[in-house]
């Protein structure tokens, strides 16, 4: 792999590994388990590697992302797809799953928590890497005896807890990459580390529309690349080794997250069942 492809992985891959194999207690071995997993925000940096690890471990993966980003996920072998613009519950059920064993929410869980409560199987695991300023109605999970698992990649270093395990995880990931079981998640590469490219990369992140990972590659230089050197590659044409950079303007179909565009945030259980979950709530 190139330096950029390698640099795209460590933080997101360790996050995904810890969520799956430590927090959710899924066996960390090839085809070691079975069952199903719903991944919300599957085309992002963590999602793009997490779906690969979940498949490697033996899980059936259902990926939630904007339709424009489905080709990105399909190149990783993910073919069960749902669009976050529409209600998730009927989409997942249409794929043949009344409930799933695991749900990984890699974006603010608030807009999705009703669907999560409906779709998670009894004794299942719901994992999140994203905090929210709103209260989550976790009591909705109680009657199914569902575990809610949080993952934060800096927990170990912040509290000096089993820090050596992250180096061991990187060694496992390196072996899987060398064996071809995993692929890099780089989607955008800026050639040259300079103020303009840093501003462009930051602007990309602030749109919350990116897929995969962004890298900036040496050399360090003081001059920006010309606009013509920054090209958007349509998702349909992604190739394994293609490095694409951010366009001077955003694509028409941005990856806006459901329930957040207008600032309205809803916590409503789809079935309206009040038992142990309280009344429908709006924030």
Put a short name on every predicted segment.
Residues 7-86, 236-243, 247-283:
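Mid-domain Rossmann-like dinucleotide-binding core that forms the NAD(H)/NADP(H) cofactor-binding site
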Residues 87-98:
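Short amphipathic alpha-helix with an adjacent loop that forms part of the alpha/beta core around
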Residues 175, 181-188, 199-244:
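C-terminal capping/lid region of NAD(P)-dependent oxidoreductase domains
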Residues 140-189, 279-282:
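C-terminal substrate-binding/catalytic core of Rossmann-like NAD(P)-dependent dehydrogenases/reductases
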Residues 120-121:
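Helix-to-beta-strand junctions that scaffold the AdoMet/dcAdoMet cofactor pocket
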Residues 124-125, 147:
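Short glycine-centered segments of the SAM/dcSAM-binding site in methyltransferase folds
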Residues 101-104, 244:
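N-terminal Rossmann-like NAD(P) cofactor-binding module of classical short-chain dehydrogenase/reductase
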């Amino acid at each position: 792999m190139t330096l950029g492809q390698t640099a795209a992985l460590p933080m997101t891959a360790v996050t995904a590994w810890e969520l799956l194999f430590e927090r959710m207690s899924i066996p960390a071995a090839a085809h070691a388990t079975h069952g199903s997993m719903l991944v919300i925000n599957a085309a992002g940096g963590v999602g793009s590697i997490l779906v690969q690890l979940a498949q490697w471990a033996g899980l059936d993966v259902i990926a939630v992302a904007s339709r424009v980003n489905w080709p990105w996920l399909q190149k990783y072998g993910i073919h069960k797809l749902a669009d976050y613009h529409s209600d998730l519950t009927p989409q997942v059920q249409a794929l043949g799953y009344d409930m799933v064993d695991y749900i990984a929410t890699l974006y603010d869980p608030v807009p999705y928590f009703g669907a999560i409560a409906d779709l998670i199987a009894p004794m299942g695991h719901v994992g999140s890497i994203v905090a929210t300023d709103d209260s989550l109605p976790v009591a909705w999970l109680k009657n199914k005896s569902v575990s809610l698992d949080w993952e934060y990649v800096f927990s170990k270093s912040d509290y000096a807890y089993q820090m050596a395990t992250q180096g061991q995880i990187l060694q496992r990931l390196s072996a899987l990459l060398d064996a071809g079981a995993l692929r890099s998640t780089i989607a955008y590469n800026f050639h040259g580390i300079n103020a303009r490219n840093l501003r462009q990369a930051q602007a990309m992140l602030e749109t919350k529309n990116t897929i995969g990972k962004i890298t900036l590659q040496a050399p360090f230089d003081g001059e920006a690349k010309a606009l013509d050197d920054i090209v958007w590659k349509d998702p349909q044409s992604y190739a394994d080794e293609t490095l694409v950079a951010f366009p001077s303007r955003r694509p028409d179909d941005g990856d806006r997250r459901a329930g957040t565009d207008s600032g309205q945030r809803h916590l409503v259980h789809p079935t309206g069942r009040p038992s142990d979950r309280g009344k429908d709530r709006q924030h």
